[in-house]
């Protein structure tokens, strides 16, 4: 039986490219893709077929529907070989001093539900299936450079990704490394819809002009990464396995320690 991989945020950007890379790297695997919008998921299924790519349109914070998906995977395959937790959101982009209303706190809560609590729930649900893999069950979290350094207006996002980094360490501490491993990867500044939103709406609304200028210049100088670049690293980790030496670690996509998996 081929590997069974679950990818969240699979309808666009890094997630969509990751589905393609995983299937093309391992033609025996089955990928389950989850996202809130269907168009990108449909295009992937048309390209690769329903036997290779199975998708569900849902919000990852909807625990009952995620439970149903995990149960479906259990009944059909009896195992799960890897997860890439890619789904995430950036909003609210706003300074801490301006985040002083009940609505602001609700936005923080929504972001943490998507970027962190839904992932905690998913991992807890999937651990038995990951441990049933004949290989090591690999959990790859898409983190961010904002988890380890401040970005103007990104406090909610950065805090949620920092929590994710710590969660990976906790998994590595609690679970036997011959059964389950976890790693956090910062994908770099990638040419995705999120970057467009930063340049056109979120950044002008919530960042200082100086802070926003970096992202604008990366775009103007064609320095944004193609999604294929981080997707290749994520695919290798979830398919070939997280090295034991990197279990629980946070790394940038181009960290030299990833050499063995960058291929």
Curated annotation (Swiss-Prot):
Its EC number is 1.1.1.320. Induction: By single-strand DNA damage. It catalyses: (S)-benzoin + NADP(+) = benzil + NADPH + H(+); 2-hydroxy-1-phenyl-1-propanone + NADP(+) = 1-phenyl-1,2-propanedione + NADPH + H(+). It holds the Pfam family adh_short. Keywords: NADP, Oxidoreductase. Gene3D superfamilies: NAD(P)-binding Rossmann-like Domain. The active site is at residues 143, 157, 161. The keyword tRNA-binding does not apply. It is an enzyme of class 1 (oxidoreductase). Disruption phenotype: Displays increased levels of spontaneous RAD52 foci in proliferating diploid cells. NADP(+) binds at residues 7, 86, 157, 161, 190, 192. Belongs to the short-chain dehydrogenases/reductases (SDR) family. Reduces benzil stereospecifically to (S)-benzoin. Also reduces 1-phenyl-1,2-propanedione to 2-hydroxy-1-phenyl-1-propanone. Is probably involved in a pathway contributing to genomic integrity. This is Benzil reductase ((S)-benzoin forming) IRC24. The lineage of its organism: Eukaryota, Fungi, Dikarya, Ascomycota, Saccharomycotina.
């Amino acid at each position: 039986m081929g590997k069974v991989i679950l990818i969240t945020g699979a309808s666009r950007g890094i997630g969509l490219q990751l589905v393609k890379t995983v299937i093309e790297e391992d033609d025996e695997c089955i990928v389950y893709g989850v996202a809130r919008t269907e168009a990108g998921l449909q295009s992937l299924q048309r390209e690769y077929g329903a036997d290779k790519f199975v998708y569900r349109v849902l919000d990852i914070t909807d625990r009952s529907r995620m439970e149903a998906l995990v149960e479906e995977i259990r009944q059909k395959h009896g195992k799960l070989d890897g997860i890439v937790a890619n789904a995430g959101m950036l909003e609210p982009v706003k300074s801490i001093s301006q985040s002083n209303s009940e609505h602001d706190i609700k936005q923080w809560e929504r972001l943490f539900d998507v970027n962190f609590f839904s992932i905690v729930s998913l991992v807890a649900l999937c651990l038995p299936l990951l441990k049933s893999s004949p290989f090591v069950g690999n959990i790859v979290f898409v983190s961010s450079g904002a988890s380890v350094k401040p970005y103007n207006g990104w406090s909610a996002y950065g805090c949620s990704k920092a929590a994710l980094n710590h969660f990976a360490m906790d998994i590595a501490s609690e679970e036997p490394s011959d059964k389950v491993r976890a790693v956090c990867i910062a994908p770099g500044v990638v040419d995705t819809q999120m970057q467009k939103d930063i340049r056109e709406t979120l950044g002008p609304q919530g960042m200082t002009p100086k802070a926003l200028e970096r992202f604008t210049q990366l775009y103007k100088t064609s320095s944004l990464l193609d999604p294929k670049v981080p997707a290749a690293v994520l695919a290798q980790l979830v398919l070939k396995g997280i090295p034991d030496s990197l279990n629980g670690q946070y790394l940038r996509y181009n960290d030299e320690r990833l050499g063995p998996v960058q291929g």
